[in-house]
């Protein structure tokens, strides 16, 4: 798929670091990589920027096609771009969308801002042109207590100005903090004040003074190379399980806000709504499922059949229904060839079995508008499209 360039000139903006699974929180373009352009900063829309959006905290494995599909479901897009590291090709966790109609841009913010995708909660907002006052406002912080949370990190730095994004790096296997974080302020002068106030200080719980400096310091090139190797490692993995209760709370809020969805059943979900639990990768840690005839299992993940969609349903409905539960590879609404209306069903492919099963257990029986959804793993029975 060819992608149109954005009207926004991003080549003149300051470089950032890629956002990968080494973070314990969703990343924005708040880090320090010299191989990519910096995003435009978020802020109030002007007359010239009411169609231009910046999207932060995207999942590391989200593709450009999925990015376009998600935002294209809202309205006609003039251009969009998922920003990648120029050397490694890895997604940096943010992108830009430029709509033709300002109303669609506003709708995208109202509908998709705060949407949970995999382990991240995306942030959708208007973009504003970069300027000297907001360039180079990224800070690198080391020596943090291993017990410090992202919220505590923000509380520590928030006294110096408005924080755009923050993150703490964690060990990919254990999920334990590496004691290193990043803070992006709204303005460079705020970052300068934070350096003056906190560099060499000992925050609560710290045994050693912390180091606070600008993230784009050339001396960090070796760290950038190490991060790039980590991102490209085939053995990397996301730490820890997803917190499904938090996701479920987010789903209820999102569906009620966007579609007026109400849970049809007040009691527990019937056992038939959720297939027996087993590992999608191995059985007893030894036997691969490749080649086994298991409902819903495909070469790219777990395919879910969604039935009783309304004729006006599109891909955005499926994205918003299933995104809160985990990694969604792709979605597809089956349409009538003549009318281009939804034929009443669609498919969602999710990477992880547990996440797919949780989505089925939660969404089977949901009332979407005046229809009750039937959600299950796809069987081998062919569905005519």
From Swiss-Prot:
**PTM annotation (Asymmetric dimethylarginine): residues:** 248
Impact upon substituting residue 165 to A: Decreased dendritic localization and decreased translation of reporter mRNA
PTM details?
Methylated by CARM1, which leads to reduced RNA-binding activity and enhanced interaction with SMN. Methylation at Arg-248 by CARM1 weakens protective binding to the 3'UTR of CDKN1A mRNA and down-regulates CDKN1A protein expression, thereby maintaining cells in a proliferative state. Methylation is inhibited by NGF, which facilitates neurite outgrowth.
> Which Pfam families does this entry report, sorted A to Z?
RRM_1 (PF00076)
Give the principal location in a single coarse category: cytoplasm
Q: Does the keyword Repeat apply?
A: yes
Q: Where is this region: Disordered?
A: 12-48
Induction context: Up-regulated by glucose and by insulin. Up-regulated after memory training in radial arm maze experiments. Up-regulated after sciatic nerve injury. Up-regulated during adult neuronal stem cell differentiation.
Q: Where is the composition biased (Low complexity)?
A: 18-33
The Polar residues compositionally biased stretches are 34-44
Chain ranges of the RRM domain: 51-129, 137-217, 302-380
Inactivation phenotype: Transiently impaired neurite extensions of several cranial nerves, including glossopharyngeal nerve, hypoglossal nerve, trigeminal nerve and acousticofacial nerves in the midembryonic nervous system at 10.5 dpc, however no developmental delays of the nervous system in later-stage embryos at 14 dpc are obvious. By postnatal weeks 4 to 8, 70-80% of the mice exhibit an abnormal clasping reflex of the hind limbs upon being suspended by the tail. Decreased motor coordination, as impaired performance on an accelerating rotarod is observed.
Which domain of life does this protein belong to? Eukaryota
Tissue/organ expression: Expressed in the brain, including the hippocampus, and in pancreatic beta cells (at protein level). Expressed in pyramidal neurons of the hippocampal CA3 and CA1 region and in the hilus but not in dentate granule cells (at protein level). Expressed in the dorsal root ganglion and the spinal cord (at protein level). Expressed in neural stem and progenitor cells (at protein level).
- Give residue numbers for the modification (Phosphoserine): 38, 233
Keywords associated with the record: Cell projection, Cytoplasm, Methylation, mRNA processing, mRNA splicing, Phosphoprotein, Repeat, RNA-binding
A GO molecular-function descriptor: mRNA 3'-UTR AU-rich region binding
Q: What GO biological process term is on the record, naming one?
A: RNA processing
Q: Which Gene3D superfamilies match?
A: 3.30.70.330
- GO CC entries: axon; cytoplasm; dendrite; growth cone; perikaryon; ribonucleoprotein complex
Q: Which residues carry this modification: Omega-N-methylarginine?
A: 248
Q: What is known of its domains?
A: The RRM 3 domain is required for binding to poly(A) RNA, for the association with polysomes and with the EIF4F cap-binding complex and for the stimulation of translation. The RRM 1 and RRM 2 domains may contribute to polysome association and stimulation of translation.
The entry sums up its family as follows: Belongs to the RRM elav family.
Assembly and binders: Component of a TAU mRNP complex, at least composed of IGF2BP1, ELAVL4 and G3BP. Associates with the EIF4F cap-binding complex, composed of EIF4G, EIF4A, EIF4E and PABP. Within the EIF4F cap-binding complex, interacts with EIF4A. Interacts with SMN (via Tudor domain) in an RNA-independent manner; the interaction is required for localization of ELAVL4 to RNA granules. Interacts with MAP1 light chain LC1 (via C-terminus); the interaction contributes to the association of ELAVL4 with microtubules. Interacts with MAP1 light chain LC2.
Function recorded in the entry:
RNA-binding protein that is involved in the post-transcriptional regulation of mRNAs. Plays a role in the regulation of mRNA stability, alternative splicing and translation. Binds to AU-rich element (ARE) sequences in the 3' untranslated region (3'UTR) of target mRNAs, including GAP43, VEGF, FOS, CDKN1A and ACHE mRNA. Many of the target mRNAs are coding for RNA-binding proteins, transcription factors and proteins involved in RNA processing and/or neuronal development and function.
- Protein name per UniProt: ELAV-like protein 4
Q: Which organism is it from?
A: Mus musculus
